[in-house]
C-alpha cells in the first residue's frame, strides 16, 4: 500500500515538473503597428502569426475595431474555415479575407476608406492548443494625401543617384563616341592631304621630265 502511494507521489511530482518545463503554448502576432492610407482607397491590414501547433480547421481569426474618438469595440471580420463578413455596421460590404492560414497569414482587405475609419484594428489568432498570446494591433490613419516618410525620402535619394549615374554614363559614352568620330575625321583628312600632295608631286615630276625631254 505504501509502495503504491509513494509511486503515485513520484509520478505526480514528475508530472508537475514536466508541466513547468514545457513551453507555454502561445500564438505570436506580427503587424505593421502603424498604417497610413489615403481617403477613398483600399488598404490591406497585414497580420501574420507563428504557432507551435500545426495549422488546422480549429484555427480562428477575429478582427475588431476601436474608434479613435472612443466608443465601444466593433466587429470587423471573423474567419473559421470560411470567412464571415459583418452583416451590418460600418464595415458591411467593405471588408474581405486576404489571408492564407497555410502561410500563417491572417490579413484582411478594407475597401473605400473613410475618415471615420481612423482608429485601432486588432487581430486575434487562436490555433488550439495555442490559444494564448498578445493581440496584434494596427493604428490606421486615413489622410487626404500620404506624407513622405523616411523610406520615401531614401527611395527618392537612391532613385535620383541612380538616374544621375545613368546620365553620367550616357555623357561619357557620347563623349567617347564624339572623340572617336573626330579622330576618324582628322585621320581621313590627313590621308586626303597626303594623297593630294603625292599627286601634286607626281604631276610636278611629270612636268619636269617633259621639260627635260623637250630640251
Swiss-Prot record:
PANTHER family reported in the protein's UniProt record: MYELIN P0 RELATED (PTHR13869), MYELIN PROTEIN ZERO-LIKE PROTEIN 2 (PTHR13869:SF21)
CDD domains assigned: IgV_EVA1
GO biological process: anatomical structure morphogenesis; cell-cell adhesion; homophilic cell adhesion via plasma membrane adhesion molecules
GO CC terms: cytoskeleton; plasma membrane
Designated name of the protein: Myelin protein zero-like protein 2
Membrane topology: Single-pass type I membrane protein
Residues in Ig-like V-type domain copies: 27-141
PROSITE patterns, sorted: IG_LIKE
Stated family: Belongs to the myelin P0 protein family.
TM spans (from-to): 155-175
Topological region Extracellular: 27-154
Signal sequence region: 1-26
Cystine bridges: 47-123
Amino acid at each position: 500500500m505504501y509502495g503504491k502511494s509513494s509511486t503515485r507521489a513520484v509520478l505526480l511530482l514528475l508530472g508537475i515538473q514536466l508541466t513547468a518545463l514545457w513551453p507555454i503554448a502561445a500564438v505570436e502576432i506580427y503587424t505593421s503597428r502603424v498604417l497610413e492610407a489615403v481617403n477613398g482607397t483600399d488598404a490591406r491590414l497585414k497580420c501574420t502569426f507563428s504557432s507551435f501547433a500545426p495549422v488546422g480547421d480549429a484555427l480562428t481569426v477575429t478582427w475588431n475595431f476601436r474608434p479613435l474618438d472612443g466608443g465601444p469595440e466593433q466587429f470587423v471580420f471573423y474567419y473559421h474555415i470560411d470567412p464571415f463578413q459583418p452583416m451590418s455596421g460600418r464595415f458591411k460590404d467593405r471588408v474581405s479575407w486576404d489571408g492564407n492560414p497555410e502561410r500563417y497569414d491572417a490579413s484582411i482587405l478594407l475597401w473605400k476608406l473613410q475618415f471615420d475609419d481612423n482608429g485601432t484594428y486588432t487581430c486575434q489568432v487562436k490555433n488550439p492548443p495555442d490559444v494564448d498570446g498578445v493581440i496584434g494591433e494596427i493604428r490606421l490613419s486615413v489622410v487626404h494625401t500620404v506624407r513622405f516618410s523616411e523610406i520615401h525620402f531614401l527611395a527618392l535619394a537612391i532613385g535620383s543617384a541612380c538616374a544621375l549615374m545613368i546620365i553620367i554614363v550616357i555623357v561619357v559614352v557620347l563623349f567617347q563616341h564624339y572623340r572617336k568620330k573626330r579622330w576618324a575625321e582628322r585621320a581621313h583628312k590627313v590621308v586626303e592631304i597626303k594623297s593630294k600632295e603625292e599627286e601634286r608631286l607626281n604631276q610636278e615630276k611629270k612636268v619636269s621630265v617633259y621639260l627635260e625631254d623637250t630640251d
